[in-house]
Amino acid sequence: MAFLKLTEQNVQGKTVLIRADMNVPFKDGKISDDTRIRASLASIQYCMDNGASVIVMTHLGRPTEGEFHPEDDVAPVAAHLGGLLGKNVKVLNDWRENKPALNAGDVVMLQNVRINKGEKKNDLELGKAYASLCDVFVNDAFGTAHRAQASTEAVAQAAPVACAGVLMAGELDALGKALKQPARPMVAIVAGSKVSTKLTILESLADKVDQLIVGGGIANTFLLAEGKAIGKSLAEHDLVEESKKIMAKMAAKGGSVPLPTDVVVAKAFTADAEAVVKDIADVAEDDMILDIGPKSAAELADLLKAAGTVVWNGPVGVFEFDQFAGGTKALAEAIAQSKAFSIAGGGDTLAAIAKFGVTDQIGYISTGGGAFLEFLEGKELPAVAALEKRGA
């Protein structure tokens, strides 16, 4: 991937427009998790340290275009950002009528981009309006890279210079390292409740990886494809044939989809359900498979420890309930101990990594969510394509 990077630009005396993803959650009117704001600090600080003035833009929530409601206001985000930077960050509501006059080191924020008409439709005129504010446009919002919108794609076409911020460049470099030129053997973990939501990822990764570990409801569908009984476990019977094709594709290239030989079952999906370890052949009609068993976890852990590259998306069991967390914990710890380059993404995966205290031992943790999944699928990300076009 060829694209310009913010850290390679001379921004002295220039106005830099940064598209960040500061779409943070609120609870009782207060920001409950500022991870996304903190993730954007590196690019903002780089510009401040190098004599630029900074305009930040972000979306917040799901407002109706052309309408402004108090809950859509980015003012709390600007105030929190200001607290982290140690300076006042003013919100600009009328930036189209009154172009801001800024000094080096100033940081301001545009009002919520999603209230602007034409934002979601990637309106070129709106993109030009954003671009008119700056000398350099920086996209640092990997989480929205799979969407072609005026603040991510059209602005990149229109700005004098368009480049990737520190966070965006880090994501793209890590994903490129993991998927374009992976160290072998390459192992992927794809888990979740449904094959249907991850089918294109499974098919895409089956072309790339040496071992494809599946977990959760996805594994149950693959177990059905192998003719195993899964009791009343969550599975998709209509995708058994697709699962067989993926296993055949892996086998044809000398790889495999290693399925559990033992599992942890319960009679109910509840926090206090009794967990019982069983061989897969002993699963009863009224059993629900809620985790992989210790024998399977140990075998998969050995695979991960010997890997050159690991891509992880999804916990292999109901890790929120401690009695069904053993499988995910064993794999998380194996990845942490492995010399492999590891990249992990997806909300549940990040929650599991945090729960088991291995955050600092994962090679790269993607902030992307949907963008991370679409990259795994091999899809072109519009905002990234726009940066590549400008960097050519």
UniProtKB/Swiss-Prot annotation:
It is found in: Cytoplasm. Substrate binds at D21, M22, N23, R36, H59, L60, G61, R62, R114, R147. The keyword Coiled coil does not apply. ATP binds at K198, E320, G346, G347, D348, T349. It is an enzyme of class 2 (transferase). Pathway: Carbohydrate degradation; glycolysis; pyruvate from D-glyceraldehyde 3-phosphate: step 2/5. Gene3D superfamilies: Phosphoglycerate kinase, N-terminal domain. It catalyses: (2R)-3-phosphoglycerate + ATP = (2R)-3-phospho-glyceroyl phosphate + ADP. InterPro entries: Phosphoglycerate_kinase, Phosphoglycerate_kinase_CS, Phosphoglycerate_kinase_N, Phosphoglycerate_kinase_sf. One of its GO terms (biological process) is gluconeogenesis. It comes from the Bacteria. Its EC number is 2.7.2.3. The keyword Cell cycle does not apply. Keywords: ATP-binding, Cytoplasm, Glycolysis, Kinase, Nucleotide-binding, Transferase. Signal peptide: none annotated. Pfam families: PGK. Its main location: cytoplasm. GO terms for molecular function: ADP binding; ATP binding; phosphoglycerate kinase activity. GO terms for cellular component: cytosol. Monomer. Belongs to the phosphoglycerate kinase family. This is Phosphoglycerate kinase. It comes from Neisseria meningitidis serogroup C / serotype 2a (strain ATCC 700532 / DSM 15464 / FAM18).
